Each structure stands twice: as C-alpha cells, then as structure tokens.
C-alpha cells in the first residue's frame, strides 16, 4: 500500500462500537502507572548562577534534605559543570535526581564565553542520548537519561535590571532547555523594589526575545493554577534548612535581627509557588518538553547534517542505503575538492618558495660580486703600497751605498795627510 493510500485510509471517518461485555483495557492506565513506579523516574536540574548566590541552599530546601556540597572558589579560571546524582524515595516512588552546578559562572573578568561551557554540556547530553538511540542494540529501558529537564536561572537581586551576562546566557539556552528564572535571596530587597524588579526582568526578556518556560495551560486539570503562576514569574525565593520557632511551631526560616523570613510563607517569598510548579504540578511536563521539543530539535539538526530528511507524501521515501550512497558521494566529492585545493596550495607554496630562493640567490650573488670588487680594490692598493715600499727601500739602499762610499773615501783621504807631513819633515 502506498503512503498516500495509508494517509487516505487514516483520514476516513472512524466508527464507534459498543462493547457487549467487559474486556479489560480500562486497566491500561493502572498498568502504565505500575510500570512507571517499578521503573522509577529521573529528573535533572541545571542550576545556573554566580558563586554564593544560594543554589545549593535552595536545592536542599526544595527537596527537604541535605545534599553533599563542595565549597566553590571565586577565582575559577573558567566555568566548570559539576553533576551530582542522588537516589530519593518518597512513599513507593523512586526518583533519580541529578543536580548540575555551574561552578565559577560569572566570576571571570572576561565573561564573554561563560555560557559556552553550559551550552556544550547540554549538547553533550543530547548527543549521548542520540548515540544510544542510533545503536542497533538499544537499551533505553536501563539507560540513565542525563538530559537537562529544567534550568533554574538564579538572578542576582540588584533591584535594577538584568545583567548583560544573564540576557546573553538565557538567549543561548532558551532553545536547548526549559528555563525558569528565579530571583535569589529575595529578602535582600524591599517588596516594592521586588515588584518593580520582576516587571523590569520580564520586560527585558520579552524585548530581547528570550523564551522562558511557560507552565502549560492546555490541560484542564492544571490550566487555572498554571495560568495564575505564569503571571508570578520570575519567582522571588528564599532558601533555608534552619528551623526557627514562630509561635508554637517550628518553621524553616531565616533569622535576622529585625525579624524572621519564613521560607514557606507566601507573603514572604515565592518558594512555595516554585516548589508547586517545579515538582508537584509540572515535573512530568518538563520531562516531556525536554524530549519532544528540545531534544527533537537537536536530533533533527543532527540527522539533517548526516543527510537524512523528511520526504513529501507524494515522493518515494529514501532508503537507508540510498541515503548512505548519496552521503558517500557527497563526501567523496568534498574530499576530492579538498585534495585539489591542498594540491594547488602546495604548488603555489613551492612556486613561492622557489621565487624566494631565486631572489635570495640573486642577493647573495650581488653581495659576492661586491665583496669580490672590494677585495680586488684592496689587493690593488696593497700591491701599490708594496711597490712604493720597494722603491723606497731601493732608494734607501742606493743612498746608503753612496754614503758608505763617501765615508770610505773621506777616511782614506784623512789617513794619507799625516803620512805626507811626516815625509816633508824628514826631507
């Protein structure tokens, strides 16, 4: 049957039939619940915020326990993702909870690439899940799903506006993860400032095109409460695991000299709203949105890069072998193109090197001829000086000989005069 025939058959009016007795498929919801409880659930939270903003404290407060923590330094060279997985149980429900902390986020002087490590981590989890899906022998039932289901983005309570880092980071993350912005340490600013700050944050998010997670309103069971809670975003929260006595009750709160801030008092902060929306009402929707929206977007992009694509209903679908052959031809063509480019680059490099060598040879030849000419000139000067010196030596020798001759003659003349005088006396 062709694809168009199947589509035409599926669009035909379906008939409703009455059952003459009990069949038993009304137990399907119970079967699904039983299977899910047996298998357990996983939930992965990414906490993005500056060091010391209260991420660990809020996680402890949300799940009413104490997770192991590690003191983080303000002098990290870069952003480091630190995942921790815990096994939790409430009644007969098992939850594998993973909390991923962004150590060193926003602590560097140059914050341009602070978001990159976070984006890479999310993509890595998507890629790991995709590789598991593409295996011939898949084991998704036992596979630990590490994809991030929600990003709690902690905003510093400045009371003015969002930092540039926050806007850039959330813009890079909104297509990859469900973002719930929260104002941390909300007890550090007044209620009037907090109200204005919330309005300013939402205005900046909308004007910059940042898509945060909206609590779903298509389910009648939760549509009303989710619609109301969407208007309270971002949640202003306070976290604390310490118990303070207020009246006759012990409540989780923060004790100050001027009073007590109760964590679960909705007139003090939005912690209860966050817990209701994150855990008690929309946890499954966050898991579903991660799979059907964010992961599907990543999966589609990756498969398109690999050469897979959807076909029109009227066209014959490509088989895996056809897709492989098309991709192989494309790869070989690209490889040949690269080889030709490299060959041409090598030829150009050789020509350039030969030209440089010839130029260098010419320069050396000119320098050699210049040195040779200088040598000849210097040799000529030395030869001229040698001849002049020889002439001077010859002239000196001649004068010396003449001088010696004169001296000899003078000596002989002087020695003959006394002899003559003696002869004259004798005569």
UniProtKB/Swiss-Prot annotation:
It comes from the Eukaryota. Residues 49-56 are annotated as: G1 motif. Residues 101-104 are annotated as: G3 motif. GO terms for biological process: cytoskeleton-dependent cytokinesis; protein localization. Residues 406-427 are annotated as: Disordered. Residues 39-305 form the Septin-type G domain. It holds the Pfam family Septin. The keyword Ribonucleoprotein does not apply. Transmembrane segments: none annotated. One of its GO terms (cellular component) is septin ring. Residues 320-407 form a coiled coil. Keywords: Coiled coil, GTP-binding, Nucleotide-binding. The keyword Flavoprotein does not apply. InterPro entries: G_SEPTIN_dom (IPR030379), P-loop_NTPase (IPR027417), Septin (IPR016491). Residues 184-187 are annotated as: G4 motif. PANTHER family: SEPTIN. This is Septin-8-B. The lineage of its organism: Eukaryota, Metazoa, Chordata, Craniata, Vertebrata.
């Amino acid at each position: 049957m062709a694809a168009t025939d199947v589509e035409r058959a599926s669009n035909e009016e379906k008939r409703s039939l009455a059952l003459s007795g009990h069949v038993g498929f009304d137990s399907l919801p119970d079967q699904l619940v039983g299977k899910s409880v047996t298998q357990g659930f996983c939930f992965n939270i990414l906490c993005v915020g500056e060091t010391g903003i209260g991420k660990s404290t809020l996680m402890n407060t949300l799940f009413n326990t104490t997770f192991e923590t590690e003191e983080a330094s303000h002098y990290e060279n870069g952003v480091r993702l630190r995942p921790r997985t815990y096994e939790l149980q409430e009644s007969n429900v098992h939850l594998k909870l993973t909390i991923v902390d962004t150590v060193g986020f926003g602590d560097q002087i140059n914050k341009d690439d602070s978001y990159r490590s976070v984006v890479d981590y999310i993509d890595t989890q998507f890629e790991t899940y995709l590789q598991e899906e593409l295996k011939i022998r898949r084991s998704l039932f036992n596979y630990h799903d590490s994809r991030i289901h929600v990003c709690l983005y902690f905003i510093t309570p400045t009371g003015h506006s969002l930092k540039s880092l926050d806007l850039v980071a959330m813009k890079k993350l909104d297509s990859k993860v469900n973002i719930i912005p929260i104002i941390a340490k909300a007890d550090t600013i007044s209620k009037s400032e907090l109200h204005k700050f919330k309005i300013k944050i939402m205005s900046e998010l909308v004007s910059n095109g940042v898509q945060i997670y909206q609590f779903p309103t298509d389910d009648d069971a939760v549509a009303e409460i989710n619609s109301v809670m969407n208007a309270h975003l971002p949640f202003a929260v306070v976290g604390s695991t310490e118990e303070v006595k207020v009246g006759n009750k012990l409540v989780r709160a923060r004790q100050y000299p001027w009073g007590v801030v109760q964590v679960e008092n909705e007139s003090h902060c939005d912690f209860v709203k966050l817990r209701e929306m994150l855990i008690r009402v929309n946890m499954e929707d966050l898991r579903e949105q991660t799979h059907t929206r964010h992961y599907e977007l990543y999966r589609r992009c990756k498969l398109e890069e690999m050469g897979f694509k959807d076909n029109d209903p009227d066209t014959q679908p490509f088989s895996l072998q056809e897709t492989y052959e098309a991709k192989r031809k494309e790869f070989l063509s690209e490889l040949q193109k690269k080889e030709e480019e490299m060959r041409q680059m090598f030829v150009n490099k050789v020509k350039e090197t030969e030209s440089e060598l010839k130029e260098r040879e010419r320069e050396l030849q000119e320098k050699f001829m210049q040195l040779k000419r200088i040598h000849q000139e210097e040799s000529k000067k030395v030869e001229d000086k040698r001849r002049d010196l020889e002439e001077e030596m010859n002239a000196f020798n001649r004068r010396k000989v003449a001088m010696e001759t004169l001296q000899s003659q003078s000596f002989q003349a002087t020695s003959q005069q006394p002899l003559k005088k003696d002869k004259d006396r004798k005569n």
